[in-house]
Each structure stands twice: as C-alpha cells, then as structure tokens.
C-alpha cells in the first residue's frame, strides 16, 4: 500500500496550510479536481511536474480522508 505520509504535507507556511505534494505548491485538491475532470494521472503528473507516485499518494490520502469523515449526501 502507498505510504502517502511521505509525499503529502500540511504546512501553515505553504498554501495557507492546505495539503500539498511535498516539495511543491501543488495542492491535493488541484490534483483531485483534475482527476474528477477526467485527466489521467500521467497527464496531471506532466502538467504539474509531479511523479506518478505523487499522484497515487494524493489518491491514497483522499481515500484515507473519505474513511474518516462523513459527508451527508441527502435523502432519496
């Protein structure tokens, strides 16, 4: 399993404390927005000068957050 803790950082001095890829100012939310828009991990990596492992770490981080937080979706 991907150890996202080695690649994702939260630092109040960088991007106002938003989660970013280590050594960059690329926010996790930007990578996820691009994935949601249909971009491939390879396209995102190239566009933002990341590695595929960085993109995979973002996905693993998001999966971990999804386990921890309940977001109400409304009733049917």
Predicted regions and their residues:
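Short, Lys/Arg-enriched anionic-surface-contact patches
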Residues: 4-26, 71-75
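Long, charge-rich, low-complexity alpha-helical segments
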Residues: 27-76
């Amino acid at each position: 399993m991907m150890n996202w803790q080695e690649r994702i950082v939260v630092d109040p001095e960088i991007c106002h404390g938003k989660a970013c890829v280590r050594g960059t100012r690329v926010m996790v939310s930007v990578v996820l927005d691009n994935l949601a828009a249909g971009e491939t991990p390879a396209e995102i990596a190239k566009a933002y000068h990341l590695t595929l492992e960085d993109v995979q770490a973002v996905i693993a981080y998001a999966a971990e957050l999804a386990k921890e937080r309940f977001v109400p979706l409304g009733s049917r």
